[in-house]
Amino acid sequence: MKKKLILVLNCGSSSVKFSIIDVIEGVLYISGIANTINNVSFLKIYDIKKKIKIVKKNISTDSYKKLILLICDLLFIHFNKYLKLIIGIGHRIVHGGKDIKKSMIINKKILLKIKKSAIFAPLHNPYHLIAIKIILNKFVKLKNRNVAVFDTSFHQTMPKKSFLYGIPYSFYKKYSIRKYGAHGINHFYITHECSLFLKKSTNNLNIISCHLGSGSSITAIVNGKSIDTSMGLTPLEGLVMGTRCGDIDPYIIIYMIKKLNFSITQIQKILTKSSGVLGISSITSDFRELEKKYYSHKKAKLAIDIFCRRVSKYIAGYSSLMPKGKLDAIVFTGGIGENSSFIRKKIIKNLSIIGFFLDIEKNLIKTGNNNRFIHTINSKPILVIPADENKIIAKETYNILIKNNF
């Protein structure tokens, strides 16, 4: 049977991740990443099947466009045999606005909606658009086989009592100001993976999914659907993150303008790039480094304590949204959620009140196929499930192409 490969692109302002996946067999062929954009420090492409690695270090590019073009050129030069088997291209899109509720074939109308929503995802949507336009020109035969998979789609099931803010209703009606959420692709994936591990249908599954990384969000999922999530109009709301502030008193912004004479541009940069655990610790946004300094650096300890406290508060709060108090599991995912036993321990320590207890030994074992559960025998389930957004994007892309008779 002819292989059906999907090229997946995940573009942000500071990194580009890409992969080629056999959507039928679920096999990863190519995995690549470029970190930072201006003066890119490295670009790595791995051929998983043949165990070949291409590394470009100290690459100097003066534009995002040139970086995407470089990635395309390297793929065509070294991996053209795989490109010939590609049947579609999936693009992760962070924000789709209020109207988009599912993955869509990319056309002029969809591009316009992505552009319109860029105000809510300035670190992502503009870069998605640059990449899409280049891909459409480079892969001409697949021009009608590009699919946008939206992070916000999974959260479109939230009720108004979850997504509306306590501001005049007219702001929602006139300007679409409401909670949209993020990380929906992975929260969707976690929902389906968790249903397999718990041997329950997604329609009967009630969980709290904790995507913890440099950007973090928590989602309350009832009967397999998102009913509330910590990120809001933008990915700035919610948990304290690597460099993002999370929930703050809105008057802080007014104070910064009126009393401290900060400009809107300065405030945006502070809240998105200089806050979070970086701002609190004054040393780094890297949670691994903060963990190492936890017992020797007061502000490193403070940053982690504040992060974990906020996560615990959200989990406890979302547990109250479960029908008849029935919460099937807490799931940890994302770079921190998957890899930091230390942070998981600190978070769960505060949740015995809602029936969750950590098995210390299981928590320390590196997550594998046989080690997803990290709770004690008298606890409700606690799982660790590695994120795999690319797998979902590839499947969604394939499904949309099939539905549209491609």
Swiss-Prot record:
Substrate binds at R92. It catalyses: acetate + ATP = acetyl phosphate + ADP. Signal peptide: none annotated. InterPro entries: Ac/propionate_kinase, Aliphatic_acid_kin_short-chain, Aliphatic_acid_kinase_CS, ATPase_NBD. Pathway: Metabolic intermediate biosynthesis; acetyl-CoA biosynthesis; acetyl-CoA from acetate: step 1/2. It is found in: Cytoplasm. The record marks H183, R244 as: Transition state stabilizer. Keywords: ATP-binding, Cytoplasm, Kinase, Magnesium, Metal-binding, Nucleotide-binding, Transferase. ATP binds at K17, H211, L212, G213, S214, G215, D286, F287, R288, G335, I336, G337, E338, N339. Coiled coil: none annotated. Its cofactor is Mg(2+); Mn(2+). It is an enzyme of class 2 (transferase). Catalyzes the formation of acetyl phosphate from acetate and ATP. Can also catalyze the reverse reaction. Homodimer. Belongs to the acetokinase family. This is Acetate kinase. It comes from Buchnera aphidicola subsp. Cinara cedri (strain Cc).
